[in-house]
Amino acid sequence: MGFDQQQLDQRENEAREFALTAHGDQRYGEHPYITHLAAVRAVLDDFGYAGELGQAAWLHDVVEDTPVTAEEIENRFGREVLDLVWAVTGVGPDRKARNQNAYSKIVAHPRAVILKLADRTANAEASPPNSSWMGMYRTEHPTFKAHLGPLLAEDPTVARMWERLDRRLDPAVAAPADQWVEIDRLVAAGEHDKALAAVRAAFECGPGEAELILAERA
């Protein structure tokens, strides 16, 4: 079962509507920008996160990409949500500088690594394997992980988030060959549900990620 936006609580609905208004006509590729925000929220849901992290998922780009100010976020949604949003807001003249700025703020507010992982995972999963965006994320990944990998390192849920992102960005991370033989056999036989279950078992992932892995295998 996918993430159901109809089940958001009042505070998250407020955050979603606020972001929808703030981003206006902005696009995420060919799609309305809310598509990306919903994808980030869905990744958090896959790992059981909600509350302030859920609110921050909808709001994480409003300070960086719209006229909304940090003060507005704090006044409307509180200090913790602002701290999460501000930590992942990159400030600087170019991408490298913005990344470094965000890394330093996330290190100072470690809980924000959960939000940043969800954001990067959603971006990577939305990028075709051979696209320039995927190439950029793969190039950045060693530095990204060197800065943020030590944060909340003892948290098993955060570790699983890293595993999901690593699988997406590192082509060398894959299921053992014998498992792929069985998965490919099931796909060839038209046993999609069984192939999906085999991918979930091999990668210890949810149905959404398993569908992406199968789609790339096709």
Ranges and model annotations:
Residues 1-177:
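Active-site helical microenvironments for divalent-metal-assisted chemistry
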